[in-house]
Each structure stands twice: as structure tokens, then as C-alpha cells.
């Protein structure tokens, strides 16, 4: 259980976010059956959040710091690292494993 990071393309290999950093990310979130439930790319605006502070799901708080700037990866988050038994009705069913294709654009 947890988060698995599957590399798609390398980043700079030296600029990694630390807890409390603001990160700018593009992402596409899907269920394991491939159904898309959210996408910053579709909105045309990257997502900005503070990492490691509980502002996002645990899978992101633990997975994003493993990425360096410019890296693209899949974060596979088990339910306990995503939305758990509640899910996020109506788009994410209870106990769903989620896949996020994430690109770390910037760390401040």
C-alpha cells in the first residue's frame, strides 16, 4: 500500500521539492480503468500546491518529492494514499486506486 512512482521522462536530477515547498505541476488523474476524472492540462493551467503539508492526498505528499524539476512520472496511489473508503463522489468511487501522470514544472 502506498504510492509507486513510475518514471516516464527524466528531470534535472538535482532540484527536488522539500516539505513546505510550493510546487507547480501539470497532471492527469485517471481511475485504473483509464477513466479520466481530472486534468490540469485540459484546463490549460498548471496546479500549484504546498507539498508535504496535507493540502493534497498523501500519495502526492510522498510521491512528488521523489521527482526532480522537469520530470514526468506516473504516481500510482492506493486508496489509503488517495481518497480511501469515502472516495470523492461522484467522480472517484470508494476504495479506488488512482493513477496520476504528473509533470513537475517548478519548485519555489
Curated annotation (Swiss-Prot):
It is found in: Cytoplasm. It comes from the Eukaryota. Inhibited by both FK506 and rapamycin. PPIases accelerate the folding of proteins. It catalyzes the cis-trans isomerization of proline imidic peptide bonds in oligopeptides. SUPFAM superfamilies: FKBP-like (SSF54534). Residues 20-108 form the PPIase FKBP-type domain. Belongs to the FKBP-type PPIase family. FKBP1 subfamily. One of its GO terms (molecular function) is peptidyl-prolyl cis-trans isomerase activity. It holds the Pfam family FKBP_C. Keywords: Cytoplasm, Isomerase, Rotamase. It catalyses: [protein]-peptidylproline (omega=180) = [protein]-peptidylproline (omega=0). The keyword Transmembrane helix does not apply. It comes from Cryptococcus neoformans var. grubii serotype A (strain H99 / ATCC 208821 / CBS 10515 / FGSC 9487). The gene is FRR1. Gene3D superfamilies: 3.10.50.40. Its EC number is 5.2.1.8. PANTHER family: FK506-BINDING PROTEIN 59-RELATED, PEPTIDYL-PROLYL CIS-TRANS ISOMERASE. This is FK506-binding protein 1. GO terms for cellular component: cytoplasm. Its main location: cytoplasm.
